[in-house]
């Protein structure tokens, strides 16, 4: 069902490569326990949600010059949300920070087998050198207070911090003093409450 929904919503994507990516996750999951998603749920909450929400996040960026966007995905694990989005938008400049070695190795394999070009940093985000990213994002990594701390040294003015969250985001905002995140609900077709906590660094 959701595999078909992905095809319908994103007809211009490289669907063959996307299927290969899903198959690699399913195969590697047997040995590495990369994600709890499998089957139709993988297409729903892994693939569709990633592409849909990343499209939404990119829409929050003031990109009148239509420049190549530099995106950092923190703790992508098996590649969500950035890899499905990269497959559909190969023109972006993607960097992934992933500290778990087994997941990092999987991402290296993905890059080689699917011929995807992205920068992979196999260490915690706190240890990477500051770069001028347009967007810093993460999904299911940490609460807002922790994300605020670990990204503090790596962003620049005008960087958009945009984190994919569930309904508990409102509690996280209350607990993150002086963080000043805005919350927006992402209307979607998978009957799931998805929110983006975002702000532009001043």
Swiss-Prot record:
InterPro entries assigned to the protein according to its UniProt record, in alphabetical order: rRNA_ssu_MeTfrase_G, SAM-dependent_MTases_sf
UniProt entry tagged with the keyword Cytoplasm: yes
EC number(s) reported in the record: 2.1.1.-
Predominant localisation class: cytoplasm
Enzyme class: transferase
Chain sites annotated for binding S-adenosyl-L-methionine: 75, 80, 125-126, 139
Presence of the UniProt keyword Metal-binding in the record: no
Domain of life: Bacteria
Cellular compartment(s): Cytoplasm
GO-annotated cellular components: cytosol
Keywords: Cytoplasm, Methyltransferase, rRNA processing, S-adenosyl-L-methionine, Transferase
GO molecular function, one term: rRNA (guanine-N7-)-methyltransferase activity
Pfam family, one: GidB
Function as written in the Swiss-Prot or TrEMBL entry: Specifically methylates the N7 position of a guanine in 16S rRNA.
Cross-referenced PANTHER family: S-ADENOSYL-L-METHIONINE-DEPENDENT METHYLTRANSFERASES SUPERFAMILY PROTEIN
Sequence similarity: Belongs to the methyltransferase superfamily. RNA methyltransferase RsmG family.
HAMAP family, A to Z: 16SrRNA_methyltr_G
Protein name stated in the entry: Ribosomal RNA small subunit methyltransferase G
Organism field: Mesomycoplasma hyopneumoniae (strain 232)
UniProt gene name: rsmG
């Amino acid at each position: 069902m959701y595999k078909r929904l992905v095809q319908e919503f994103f007809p211009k994507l490289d669907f063959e490569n996307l299927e290969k990516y899903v198959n690699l996750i399913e195969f590697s999951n047997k040995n590495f326990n990369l994600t709890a998603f499998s089957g139709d749920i993988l297409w729903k909450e892994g693939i569709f949600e990633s592409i849909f929400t990343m499209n939404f996040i990119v829409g929050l960026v003031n990109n009148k010059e239509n420049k190549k966007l530099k995106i950092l995905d923190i703790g992508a694990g098996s590649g969500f949300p950035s890899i499905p989005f990269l497959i559909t938008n190969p023109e972006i400049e993607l960097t992934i920070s992933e500290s778990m070695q087994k997941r990092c190795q999987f991402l290296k394999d993905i890059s080689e087998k699917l011929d995807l070009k992205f920068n992979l940093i196999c260490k915690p985000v706190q240890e990477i050198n500051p770069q001028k990213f347009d967007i810093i994002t993460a999904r299911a990594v940490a609460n807002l207070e922790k994300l605020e701390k670990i990204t503090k040294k790596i962003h620049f003015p005008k960087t958009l911090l945009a984190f994919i969250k569930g309904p508990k985001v409102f509690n996280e905002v209350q607990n993150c003093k002086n963080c000043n995140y805005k919350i927006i609900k992402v209307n979607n077709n998978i009957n799931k409450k998805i929110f983006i906590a975002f702000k532009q660094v001043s």
